[in-house]
Amino acid sequence: VGFKAGVKEYKLTYYTPTYETKDTDILAAFRVTPQPGVPPEEAGAAVAAESSTGTWITVWTDGLTSLDRYKGRCYHIEPVAGEESQFIAYVAYPLDLFEEGSVTNMFTSIVGNVFGFKALRALRLEDLRIPVAYVKTFQGPPHGIQVERDKLNKYGRPLLGCTIKPKLGLSAKNYGRAVYECLRGGLDFTKDDENVNSQPFMRWRDRFLFCAEALYKAQAETGEIKGHYLNATAGTCEEMMKRAIFARELGVPIVMHDYLTGGFTANTSLAHYCRDNGLLLHIHRAMHAVIDRQKNHGIHFRVLAKALRMSGGDHIHSGTVVGKLEGEREITLGFVDLLRDDFVEKDRSRGIYFTQDWVSLPGVLPVASGGIHVWHMPALTEIFGDDSVLQFGGGTLGHPWGNAPGAVANRVALEACVQARNEGRDLAREGNEIIREASKWSPELAAACEVWKEIKFEFEAMDTL
């Protein structure tokens, strides 16, 4: 057959509704909004083509390879209820298209080019199914949930954290003092804010030293293991590693990284270092809403969460369901399960498009953070369960008596909720009463209850099904 030049419709090659997906394929669910007049099959096929082997024209060198072996295929299209112009296109990618152990390469292939495509008005990657064969090429989280509990010797309850505020402007010594007060009061962790790196008012090395001093002092006084998430994020990978190495030399238990602004390549390098050197790795998702907040365009956070589990991190921020930041309950619980569990069944009511088998990849602790306070404690304990980190920044440091009493209030509230749950009480129904009872014997909690009794952030979540 001679080579026939010319532009042909994508769907002739890339729309294959009879295709049986393989266990080794990476499967993607895209929410596609085509330009008027572009039929769904053509739009779905265009997505498959442009994110795999295709280009806009038949090329001579197509004859030198086997397209059937390497092309992405749009194998199913379904309408979106209530949205005339949108549909879900399912695309299968052969495993050979991807470099082993590289989240960077996976994203460059699947979402790197196709989002600017003219025939589409909007495109959103809703979910990915990562095949076991590909999962096994990743190290994943440095330690995972069980190893973290063993390192910290803390079981049977969520962990408590606090972001040090004001996030910018404190000197290293005053910053360390705030860390000490919070840990001394009963928190497990304190945290650098995501944008605390190494600024003129507080260079990273000074902060690391004062925070290490604070946590050792609090550890000695409370007999509990304490941690402060030292943010190693930096302008270059070399500088990031230098900071992580210094943290290890100080003997602290945990460091932190902003995985989206820092990038997946840097994140995976840091995760490997953390596993080799016994450091836990806390991950902040700064910039995620730029990517995941629009309903019809971008990448859903559940995909970014899966990518983080592959790249590596022991904690990741995942919304609160109840505080000031985005997150609808069922959807949030869907990706929380994808972070923690070994095996997650397909469940469209929770936004999970594919059954995901993580085999033995360690799990990640979800971190609830943002506008939460003691009155939220029963709901958070019920929604997130034991394997989570509950982080109260303003909800600790905003206590009228100061940081340590703020920490005491949170710890008492948490212990009361865990005890009530273990006794079989219904946290959703009796939550306020449980907190009130506990506040009778904790003046710190009583003061916190008074301050936060009426604060709510009431807006509709954008991220609904």
Curated annotation (Swiss-Prot):
Free-text description of this protein's post-translational modifications in UniProt: The disulfide bond which can form in the large chain dimeric partners within the hexadecamer appears to be associated with oxidative stress and protein turnover.
Cofactor(s) for this UniProt protein: Mg(2+)
GO BP annotations, alphabetical order: photorespiration; reductive pentose-phosphate cycle
Principal EC category: lyase
Keywords per UniProt: Calvin cycle, Carbon dioxide fixation, Chloroplast, Disulfide bond, Lyase, Magnesium, Metal-binding, Methylation, Monooxygenase, Oxidoreductase, Photorespiration, Photosynthesis, Plastid
Chief localization: plastid
Residues with N6-carboxylysine modification: K191
Record-marked site positions (Transition state stabilizer): K324
Catalytic reactions on record: 2 (2R)-3-phosphoglycerate + 2 H(+) = D-ribulose 1,5-bisphosphate + CO2 + H2O; D-ribulose 1,5-bisphosphate + O2 = 2-phosphoglycolate + (2R)-3-phosphoglycerate + 2 H(+)
Cofactor note: Binds 1 Mg(2+) ion per subunit.
Chain positions with N6,N6,N6-trimethyllysine modification: K4
Residues annotated as catalytic: K165, H284
Keyword Chloroplast on entry: yes
Residues noted as binding Mg(2+) in the record, renumbered to the chain: K191, D193, E194
Name of protein: Ribulose bisphosphate carboxylase large chain
Organism field: Cornus florida (Flowering dogwood)
Lineage: Eukaryota, Viridiplantae, Streptophyta, Embryophyta, Tracheophyta
